[in-house]
């Protein structure tokens, strides 16, 4: 079954290229899906192309992450419509931006819900891609909130105003990447110091809890950290995570013909492997460069095979414009969600940056 899925993926890719769907158009189509799935405030969370219906479901964290992808794609593709959508989304989410009564730091809360670290991370990542007039002050406030929620052991609280944790594999990596990108913009030493203090904790956490969910965000964060403060310990950590990701998808240990049968989550993995590849190239590690490069190229092909297009409609002849460019969950489940296109867009943009997506 896995072999058949790979064959399907490559034949779909070849067919799309032959029909004139250029690589540069692919990311634009993925981003355009956002434009075709707007609601009054920002985006519909889910779309069912079979029923031609948007669900009433909401997922604020994933919707904030999609805002980052929309804003970044708008800038990278120089697309005014995407930039306008990003402004619309930011205006919506700004209604949920708050300041702590005692310390004055910024946080995001939707209604009476929990205050997740991931919200602050995506607020920072999104603001960095916008020209919001309050941008600088907001960035400072959100960063202060993350700084104040770092513990003595270097770990980050994943929920503010709570004594329990959740999504440790996700939120800290998202926040570390946000702080590194903010450091790159401001050169504020405290932001770099936070990421450095977090390193031993999350390095040890991964050694004790290896899993694919942890790898993409931490790989991106510590690639960025290495650019500012290089050390072999940090590069070894990025490569340890990259090697683990390869092993999880390459049971034959050939560094090719990877098993990408898990569906749209492949895009998440490619995001981290883009940076692992770039670090291998930077350090002249030819074996990892070749292996990681194969992972990214094959991963992108697998993602593209899941993109709904006129000539890749999964047998669904009667569909609406809202389906075009969307990333389906799998070739058996055609449901579309904002986070699937978010990860696809960012994976492809990252592969373009790495020189792996001509």
Predicted regions and their residues:
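Positively charged n-region of N-terminal signal peptides that target proteins for export
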Residues: 1-7
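Bacterial N-terminal signal peptides
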Residues: 9-17
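Low-complexity, Ser/Thr/Pro/Gly-enriched N-terminal "stalk/linker" regions
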Residues: 21-63, 69, 76, 80-104, ...
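Extended, well-ordered alpha-helical scaffold segments
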Residues: 23-34, 78-96, 133-149, 186-205, ...
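Active-site cradle of extracellular carbohydrate-active enzymes
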Residues: 35-38, 42-43, 141-174, 178-182, ...
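Solvent-exposed loop and edge beta-strand segments that line ligand/cofactor-binding
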Residues: 48-64, 103-120, 159-172, 186-188, ...
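Well-ordered alpha-helical scaffold segments within catalytic/enzyme domains
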Residues: 64-80, 121-134, 174-188, 217-231, ...
């Amino acid at each position: 079954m896995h072999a058949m899925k790979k064959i399907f993926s490559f034949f779909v890719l070849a067919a799309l290229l032959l029909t004139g769907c250029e690589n540069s158009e692919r990311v634009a189509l993925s981003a355009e899906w956002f434009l075709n799935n707007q609601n009054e405030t920002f985006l519909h969370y889910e779309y069912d192309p079979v029923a031609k219906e948007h669900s009433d479901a909401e997922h604020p964290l994933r919707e904030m992450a999609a805002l980052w992808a929309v804003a970044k794609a708008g800038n990278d593709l120089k697309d005014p419509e995407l930039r306008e959508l990003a402004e619309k989304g930011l205006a919506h989410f700004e209604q949920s931006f708050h300041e702590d009564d005692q310390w004055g730091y910024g946080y995001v809360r939707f209604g009476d819900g929990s205050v997740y670290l991931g919200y602050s991370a995506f607020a920072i990542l999104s603001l960095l891609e916008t020209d919001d007039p309050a941008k600088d002050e907001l960035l400072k406030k959100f960063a202060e909130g993350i700084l104040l929620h770092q513990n003595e052991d270097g770990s980050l609280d994943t929920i503010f105003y709570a004594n329990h944790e959740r999504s440790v594999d996700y939120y800290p990596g998202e926040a570390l990447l946000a702080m590194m990108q903010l450091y790159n913009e401001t050169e504020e030493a405290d932001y770099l110091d936070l990421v450095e203090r977090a390193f031993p904790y999350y390095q040890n956490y991964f050694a004790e809890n290896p899993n694919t969910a942890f790898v993409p965000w931490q790989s991106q964060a510590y690639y960025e950290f290495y650019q500012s403060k290089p050390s072999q310990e940090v590069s070894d950590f990025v490569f340890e995570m990259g090697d683990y990701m390869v092993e999880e998808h390459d049971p034959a240990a050939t560094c090719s013909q990877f098993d990408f049968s898990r569906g749209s989550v492949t895009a998440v993995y490619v995001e981290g492997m883009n940076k692992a590849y770039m670090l291998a190239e930077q350090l002249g590690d030819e074996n990892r460069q070749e292996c990681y490069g194969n992972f990214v190229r094959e991963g992108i092909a697998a993602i593209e095979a899941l993109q709904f297009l006129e000539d890749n409609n999964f047998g669904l002849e009667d569909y609406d414009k809202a389906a075009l460019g969307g990333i389906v969950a799998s070739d058996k489940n055609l449901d579309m969600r904002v986070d699937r296109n978010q990860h696809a867009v960012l994976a492809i943009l990252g592969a373009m940056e790495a020189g792996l997506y001509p």
